[in-house]
Amino acid sequence: MNKCVELVVGKNIRCLREKSGMTQDMLAAKLQLSGCDITRSAIAKIEVAQRHLYPDEIILIKEILDVSYDEIFDIQ
């Protein structure tokens, strides 16, 4: 992904995570339970575009936060 897109996607994930009442620790734990090898620190880096998102992580984040891909990739 392009850096500008990663910034927007990261902000969207943070906003959606906070809207669902979930902390970075909680999201990381749910991702880990779903088989994703990720830490709270990695979530923090994703939210500020310091780490790339992998397709399997995007799919799981979408499912855990119960949002659509459009909400995650909403670039306006």
Language-model-derived ranges and their functions:
Residues 32-52:
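Recognition helix of helix-turn-helix/homeodomain-like DNA-binding domains
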